[in-house]
Structures are given as structure tokens and as C-alpha cells.
Amino acid sequence: SRCRGYKKCVEQCPYKKPMFRGTTRISEKCIACYPRIEGLDPLTEGDQMETRCMAACVGKIRLQGLVKIGSNGEWAHDPDNPQYYLIRDRKVALPLYPQLGTEPNGYYVPSRHVPRAYSQQMFGPGVDHSIDQYMVPDRDLLGVLQLFRTTQRIIFKWKREPGPKIFETNIHGKKFEMYNDTVIGFNRKGKEIIRVTVEEPFYVRPEEHPGAI
């Protein structure tokens, strides 16, 4: 009838969502910072924000968002949404253990440095396709990847503005061309919330303030 703090749910959950709180001696589940997700946090001025754990990630490796759901309960076709584009359109981000059929809300871009057989066990047969795509990304895919960890606000739509060609090489026998495109992210209301370029800009510190940023 109540949690007794055996922590079995913590051991069994593949996503490690339940957390054991020592002060109350019960297991509690992550609530996904729902006031921030729903735009109810008074500090966010109505903008829907990522969870705190996403915002605290120091690496540019996480992207959180919301997708449209159709009348049939499935994801509505929306390639302008960065999550839909990466997961359903390009199939670069994959679900964990797809053979279990749980369809999680967490998707992962498999690493090319991990043994391929191990990645296939975790993410299924789409691993080769995913790695092949982001190893030699086209302009759209490279643009969307620039949006990772650029803002705490949830991006509902993205757009790429063409830029000049800045680099060209061959990767595993495939031609790769890089363009300094500008990628723009928009919130649910269509307002621009982030604008980044593919090439990271250089900032020159003035001589009179050598320690300034």
C-alpha cells in the first residue's frame, strides 16, 4: 500500500528515472520539471523551457522538445520540428532497446567509437544508417545538429539560411562540403529564440583588457 524503499524500481528501470530519497526513505520519480515544460514557470515569461537536467548539461549533446500528436495518437508529420527531423525523418536518433517495443521518449545518436555490435544490440539495426549519415552530414542535418544546447527554450521549428562554402574534404571516400549556414530556432508562437552559424565565430580580446571575455 506504500513505498517501503526497497529500491527495486531503481534497479529495474532501464532509464533510471526513479530516485531514492534518503530523507523520506521512499523512491520518487522524476516529474520532468512540468512547470517549465508547460511554460508555467513565472521566470520564463511564458516560454516553454527544457528541464533543469537538460539545462545543466555542460556538453552540447542533448536536445529536448515537444512534437505534435495527430488524431490517431501518432506523431504528426512535421519535418520543421528538430526532434521529428532527427528521429522520424532522418532516423539519426534511435530508441533504446527497440525490440522491447516500449517506444521511449528518450532517443540517442549512437556513437561511432563504440563497438558496432554493442550499439546494434542497444539501438537495433538502424545504427549503421545513423552513423553513416552524421559522419558525412548534409547541410540540413549539420544545421540541426548545431541547435544542441544553444538555448534552454524549447525549439518547435527550425530554419536554415544558406551561407558561403568554407571547407571541403573527403571522409571515408565520400565528398563533404561545409557551408557557413545560419540556423534559426523558433518557439511555439513562431518567435525567433536562437540564431547560430555552423562555423563558430572568433572573438578577439582587446589589448587594453587582456583578461576580458
For each feature predicted by the language model, list its residue ranges.
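Iron-sulfur cluster-binding cysteine motifs and their immediate structural context
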Residues: 1-27, 32, 39-72, 84-86, ...
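Long, compositionally biased charged/polar accessory segments in the mid-to-C-terminal portions
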Residues: 54-213
